[in-house]
Amino acid sequence: MLLHNKTLAGKALAFIAEEGYVPSMREKFLGWNVPPEYSDLVHPHWRAFPAPGKHFHIGLAIIYSMLLIMSLVGNCCVIWIFSTSKSLRTPSNMFIVSLAIFDIIMAFEMPMLVISSFMERMIGWEIGCDVYSVFGSISGMGQAMTNAAIAFDRYRTISCPIDGRLNSKQAAVIIAFTWFWVTPFTVLPLLKVWGRYTTEGFLTTCSFDFLTDDEDTKVFVTCIFIWAYVIPLIFIILFYSRLLSSIRNHEKMLREQAKKMNVKSLVSNQDKERSAEVRIAKVAFTIFFLFLLAWTPYATVALIGVYGNRELLTPVSTMLPAVFAKTVSCIDPWIYAINHPRYRQELQKRCKWMGIHEPETTSDATSAQTEKIKTDE
């Protein structure tokens, strides 16, 4: 609950700023257990809020423990099956494996948060904060650009099925680019060259600083917002828009030809293959939508921190976007398990106990062989 008595808050903040932390108020305000030498990790904004009860921390620890298990099981399963199945070792699926790796990197944050929740402070202080933030920065920006790469691949594969498919070398170059993309805004705050990492919310998680009231912080947050969110979003919307346009034009052409030939349908084996690819594209679009749902609240919080009304930024309102982001990294692999036809076939073969029933299709085999030939070029 937000402290409404402004006079009391002002006195508390003044005393805290002078003394570093206040033993007599340990059960009342955030930052009560942060010693003076680490006081820079806690922005004065958070010190005006009552410290959350232990049950809040335990609740978060339980939630993140469940998310950790789901993420590791799901993403490791994706990497295992896509990497060891010949029919799934295609350039397009290299992006899926890359996305799963970024999701696992995000999962590395979760044990740190669980431990921090029981300690009611950030584990490892400044070093722990930096490590936690680096994991979040790499995984968040990596997921964004990998989603953009998947959108580009789906557009090329479906719009130009004969000569538009990426080969393995091209896919590897794009994946390497996604790793390059995450580097600047991960390393600069880490080295404190531009921006910095600091605690947020319940002070058991860390991210880049979006509360310091100076021009340097405003410019940094604006740039990372454009770099990590806006640019990937533009690419994703562009490629999926073109993909939808291509599908509509293709279907329109088939209807017109069928009408001229006085037949019901002109669907061939190639069109059945295209239908399977469209199904996979729908999976990719679903994951993009989940990404948007997860990271838009976090981006909004950061912008409010530098440009908006900071009274809206309570510990709870800044912790929830982090939970959403972690949840999506756990859901991604299960979306594929439910919807990806060839992935379901492999799961059916290797994990019969899951009770999956996905029939073998000629179109899937043809698609796999086509991509395999393209890979070897």
UniProtKB/Swiss-Prot annotation:
InterPro entries found in the cross-reference section:
GPCR_opsins, GPCR_Rhodpsn, GPCR_Rhodpsn_7TM, Opsin, Retinal_BS
PTM-bearing positions, type N6-(retinylidene)lysine: 326
What gene is this protein translated from?
Answer: BLOP
User: Transmembrane region positions?
Assistant: 57-81, 94-119, 133-152, 171-195, 220-247, 283-306, 315-339
Q: In Gene Ontology terms, what is one molecular function of this protein? A: G protein-coupled receptor activity
The domain of life for this entry's organism is Eukaryota
Recall the taxonomic lineage recorded for the source organism: Eukaryota, Metazoa, Ecdysozoa, Arthropoda, Hexapoda
Report the PTM annotation: Phosphorylated on some or all of the serine and threonine residues present in the C-terminal region.
Q: One GO biological process from the UniProt record?
A: detection of light stimulus involved in visual perception
Expressing tissues: Expressed in the dorsal region of the retina and sparsely expressed in the ventral region.
Q: Which residues lie on this side of the membrane: Extracellular?
A: 1-56, 120-132, 196-219, 307-314
Specify the protein name.
Answer: Opsin, blue-sensitive
Family under the similarity heading? Belongs to the G-protein coupled receptor 1 family. Opsin subfamily.
Q: What this chain does, per the record?
A: Visual pigments are the light-absorbing molecules that mediate vision. They consist of an apoprotein, opsin, covalently linked to 11-cis-retinal.
Which residues pair up as cystines? 129-206
Name the SMART domains on file: 7TM_GPCR_Srsx (SM01381)
